[in-house]
Design a protein with these regions (language model features):
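Surface-exposed, glycine-biased beta-strand/turn segments
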Residues: 1-89, 98-102, 127-128, 137
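Acidic, glycine-rich catalytic/binding loops that coordinate metals and/or anionic ligands
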Residues: 2-17, 103-105, 121-127, 149-214
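Zn2+-dependent peptidoglycan hydrolase active-site motif and core
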Residues: 55-58, 72-119, 141-152, 158
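Conserved beta-strand positions that form and line the central face of beta-propeller blades
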Residues: 61, 92, 111, 134, ...
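Active-site acidic-Proline motif in GNAT/NAT acetyltransferases
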Residues: 64-66, 117-118, 122
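Soluble non-cytosolic domains of exported or imported proteins
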Residues: 64-67, 106, 141, 170
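Nucleotide phosphate-binding site architecture
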Residues: 79, 133, 177
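Beta-rich strand-turn-strand
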Residues: 119-144
């Protein structure tokens, strides 16, 4: 069984909040501020993660510019395009084969959040480095960035996906950092593919600009 390899979904990689950290606080008005760590928050605030049933941050945050392209970190299939109050717009995908990670052979479910827009649709097959969307700060975020998650998955006897570590305190997510390669997914693309991405990015920005004017 091949070991899992994830390729960085952004061209450059500046990690902000890491997996398991508990440094974000929230008040009754949904205002976010930084705490001093370990769930310690200013007066009137509580841990954002504990409030949402988590031990801490269940992914890694990577700094990004508005509309910065985000690329698929693995080969696989798009499961869904989702929009949530906390995480904003996101893309969820699954590998088509098992890999060895976290001590077993699992399918790798990767989740990408806080998008401005997406470039894929459910059930679409994607390859490492395919453009899947653009970074933003949708949902509850203090600025534009990519929230990236990894979850080990299996299929039950009915063919339904289930989360292997659902009760681990991170909604089944595990730290993706040990599986990240030095290369970005973008670096694996050909020059022609990169040109197509640039055209798609420009078209999306123009469309967004026109929509904002109407």
């Amino acid at each position: 069984m091949k070991s899992l390899e994830l390729y960085k979904p952004l061209k450059w990689w500046y990690t902000g909040q890491t997996f398991g950290q508990d440094t974000v606080c929230i008040d009754d008005n949904e205002k976010l501020v930084s705490g001093s760590g370990a769930g310690v928050c200013p007066a009137g605030f509580v841990s954002f993660y504990q409030k949402n049933g988590l031990k801490g941050h269940n992914g890694i945050d990577v700094g990004a510019d508005m509309w910065q392209p985000v690329y698929a970190s693995t080969d696989g299939t798009i499961l869904e395009i989702s929009t949530e109050a906390n995480r904003g717009m996101g893309v969820i995908m699954i590998t088509d084969e098992k890999y060895f990670f976290e001590g077993g052979d699992y399918f790798a479910r990767t989740l990408y959040w806080h998008f401005a827009g997406v470039n894929v649709k459910p059930e679409q097959k994607v390859r490492i480095g395919d453009l899947i969307g653009w970074a933003d700060s949708t949902g509850k975020a203090t600025g534009p960035h990519l929230h990236f998650e990894l979850k080990p998955m299996l299929y039950d006897t009915q063919g339904k996906l289930y989360n292997v570590f659902q009760d681990n305190g991170f909604y089944g997510a595990v730290n993706p950092e040990p599986y990240l390669q030095k290369q970005s997914a973008y670096e694996l693309k050909t020059n022609l593919e990169k040109l197509k991405d640039s055209i798609a990015e420009l078209a999306s920005k123009i469309q967004d600009y026109l929509l904002r004017k109407t």
